[in-house]
C-alpha cells in the first residue's frame, strides 16, 4: 500500500482513499484497525527490500505516515484492539532501531549522548517510584528523537523524495479532517464556550487535532 502511494503519479488517488477512510471511520471505528493491518502487512516488503539507500528512504516514508496516523488511531479508540496509545512514538523508536541495526545507520553520535543524559530520569522520579507508563508517556518521545538523530543524521533526500514525504504526512491529516467534518454537529447545536470544545474536534483533544490540521494546511 505504501508503494502504491509513493509511486502513484496522481495525488488524487491517495487523497480520495484517505477521505473515504475518514468517512468510513465515522460509521464503523473498527475500519481504522483493518486499514492499519492491511497497510502494515502490505508495506513490510517495500521497506525491507532494495539497496540500503532505498530501504532508508522507504522507512522514513513509513515512519512519517504511521506517526501522523496515530491521532486517528486515538480518535477511533484503536487501543481497544491493544494498539498502544503512544504507538506513533513506538513506530519512530523501532523504525530508528531497525535502521541502526539492520542498515548500520549510526552517524548521529549526538543522539547517543542525549540518550545517556536521559537515563537517570528512567530511575529517579522525585518523590515517587518511576513506573513503566511514566517512561512511555514522558520519555519515549525524547528517546525516539535520540535514536532518530543517530539513524537519520546526514541523510540526503531529493526534492522529489521530500514531496513524497510531505504526502505521507498529509494523507493522515486528510482522514482526520474528513472524520472531524462528519462528526461536527450543526452550529445551532454547538455550545460555544471559552474552553476546548470537543464537539468540533471529533470528540478528541483540540490541541492534537488542531495541530495536525494546521500541519496539513501549512
Language model: regions and residue ranges:
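Alpha-helical transmembrane segments of multi-pass inner-membrane proteins
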Residues: 147-148, 161-190, 204-218
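Hydrophobic membrane-targeting alpha-helices
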Residues: 24-27, 47, 67, 96-103, ...
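N-terminal signal-anchor transmembrane segment
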Residues: 2-98, 120-125
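Transmembrane helix-loop junctions and nearby membrane-interface residues
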Residues: 71-74, 78, 97-100, 104, ...
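Membrane-interfacial loop-to-transmembrane alpha-helix junctions, especially the N-terminal start
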Residues: 10-12, 49-63, 102-115, 161-169
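Helix-loop-helix junctions and helix-breaking kinks within/between transmembrane helices
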Residues: 23-35, 75-82, 130-137, 201-213, ...
Amino acid at each position: 500500500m505504501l508503494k502504491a502511494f509513493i509511486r502513484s503519479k496522481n495525488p488524487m488517488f491517495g487523497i480520495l482513499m484517505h477521505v473515504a477512510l475518514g468517512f468510513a471511520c465515522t460509521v464503523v471505528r473498527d475500519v481504522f484497525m483493518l486499514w492499519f493491518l492491511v497497510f502494515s502487512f502490505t508495506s513490510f516488503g517495500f521497506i525491507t527490500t532494495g539497496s540500503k539507500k532505498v530501504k532508508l528512504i522507504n522507512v522514513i516514508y513509513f515512519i512519517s505516515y504511521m506517526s501522523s496516523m496515530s491521532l486517528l488511531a486515538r480518535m477511533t479508540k484503536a487501543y481497544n484492539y491493544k494498539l498502544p496509545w503512544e504507538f506513533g512514538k513506538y513506530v519512530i523508536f523501532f523504525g530508528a532501531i531497525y535502521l541502526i541495526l539492520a542498515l548500520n545507520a549510526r552517524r548521529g553520535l549526538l543522539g547517543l549522548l542525549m540518550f545517556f543524559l536521559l537515563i537517570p530520569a528512567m530511575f529517579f522520579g522525585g518523590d515517587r517510584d518511576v513506573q513503566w507508563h511514566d517512561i512511555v508517556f514522558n520519555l519515549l518521545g525524547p528517546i525516539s528523537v535520540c535514536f532518530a538523530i543517530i539513524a537519520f543524521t546526514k541523510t540526503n533526500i531529493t526534492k522529489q523524495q521530500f514531496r513524497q514525504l510531505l504526502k505521507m504526512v498529509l494523507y493522515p491529516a486528510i482522514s482526520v479532517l474528513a472524520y472531524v467534518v462528519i462528526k461536527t454537529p450543526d452550529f445551532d447545536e454547538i455550545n460555544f464556550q471559552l474552553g476546548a470544545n470537543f464537539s468540533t474536534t471529533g470528540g478528541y483533544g483540540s490541541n492534537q487535532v488542531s495541530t495536525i490540521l494546521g500541519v496539513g494546511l501549512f
